[in-house]
Amino acid sequence: MSETALKPVVMYNTLSGNKQELKTIEPGRCGIYCCGPTVYGLTHLGNSRAAVVPDIMVRFLRHQGLEVKYVRNVTDIDDKIIKRSQEEGMSPDELARKYTEEYHRDLASLNTLEPDVEPKVSDTIPEILDLVQQLVDKGLAYAVDGDVYYRVKAFGGYGKLSKRSVDEMLEGAGARIEVDTRKETPLDFAVWKAAKPGEPAWDSPWGPGRPGWHIECSAMSATHLGDSFDIHGGGRDLIFPHHENEIAQSQGAHGEDTYARYWVHNGFINFAGEKMSKSLGNFFTTREITALFPGETVRYFLTTVHYRSGLNFDLEVLCPGCSAVLDKAAQESGLCPSCGMQSSTEVLKDQVRFPNLEEADDRLAYIYSTLAQARAFLTTAKEPGIAEPALDPVLGMLEAFIEHMRNDFNTGGALGVLSKPLSEVNALLTSGKGVSKAQRHGTIKAFVEQMAEVADILGCFGADPGPWLELRRDMKARRLKLDTSRVDSLLRERQTARQEKDWAAADRIRDELIALGVAVQDGPEGSTWSFI
């Protein structure tokens, strides 16, 4: 824990509409509930952002000395699961188990912590039934033909999270959605659904059925965190109706002063100007992207902007002839307007680039390269007898980083703090001119030590630099279709030329490698290569 950990954490609360100091219900402890996946398919990058954001919050609050209980649910009962199970020819339970495992695999590749509790809807049926019964007993829900609906007009605070008026919603409801005449108002939503043939069902006082979507989170959060807890998180798309309905259910059952104190919502990932989502079909799965880039690169990319901001995911298709970026029309026709080359769809599939992911990959490689050199320096350099304080900006790096994190978990601002220290350390690694040996050593040592704390908070920069850089290099080579066996062969030829003191041949081979986009690093144990 940092020595500055006693300063307050300020966070934006969707419920209040402004930033507030985090004051937990129980001093020193924090309960966090986040809506997890509906497990009917592989996760896309937007789903992964909704997991990485609370993961960083949990890491940071623990770093600041709080004892955090983190609960993230799995929705394993849902209309989408039932539909997909029929398409894949398996039971809903089998499909949910399959994609829960795949979800865990994807999050492991992004270095997310496991939640302290991961409840499933199917394991929470008794608690859900009890909550539905409480709502019925209080006149907040009513049964119709085996369905049970929440009576929205009976809850006076409805709309306070999403800042919507019940009367205005009712005025336009009939035009937006098909009206179910069995419901008292179009806004009433199901907390229990009557069984349909071939679907999962449980016995209830209202007949066989299954839970509605919103009641599930109300029941699971109360079961594991109590009627009141500190932070509720999720994607911005869940504010209405899901989180609004959670509040209505939970406060309706337990009282107006209960449920989550702070509501946090992450922004969308935007692809081609639209929110990335399964419903729109404009998404890349996390699995597809981590086949091209290290998982840590993806995680780093997700942290480069403030969690409430939108994050643009860019894709470019290049002409295989002249490397010009093709617009949508050129991609569809296959004709490059710059050089006139005609390419098939199959050829263009191999010309896809992800510029902002590549930028994140390059930046992460720069940080790991700096860490590798800094650690090597500390291993080989003789430690001075007299310690001297680190130079600015390394001296205050961690404190400045933490200040940004205290201000609504601002990872984008926190990452910006690292730029000057990285430049300073690289300069010191290259040359120690102008500073004492003790100050040079102390600055590099302080950088490595502070980066270890940064790594604990962000979940980035904590891997062994050498193996990570090799992994990154090999994955980039595959993306660029670079023949690494050819590179290795040229390195061996160059090594032979150097041993034979044929400097002209060694330089010629180096130039050939440069033309391939490869830089050579000569060391006492031989030569290695990296991308320029």
Question: Residues of each region from the PLM?
Answer:
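Structural preference for alpha-helix termini/caps and helix-kink/transition segments
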Residues: 285-532
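N-terminal, positively charged nucleic-acid-binding surface of large information/translation enzymes
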Residues: 6, 16-21, 25-113, 525, ...
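The substrate-binding groove and active-site-proximal loops of carbohydrate-active enzymes
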Residues: 85-92, 116-122, 235-236
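Short phosphate-binding/catalytic loops that engage adenosine nucleotides
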Residues: 66, 140, 518
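Short, glycine/charge-rich beta-strand/loop segments that flank catalytic centers
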Residues: 74-79, 100-103, 113-128, 146-155
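Alpha-helical recognition segments enriched in aromatics with Gly/Pro capping
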Residues: 2-40, 55, 105, 126-375
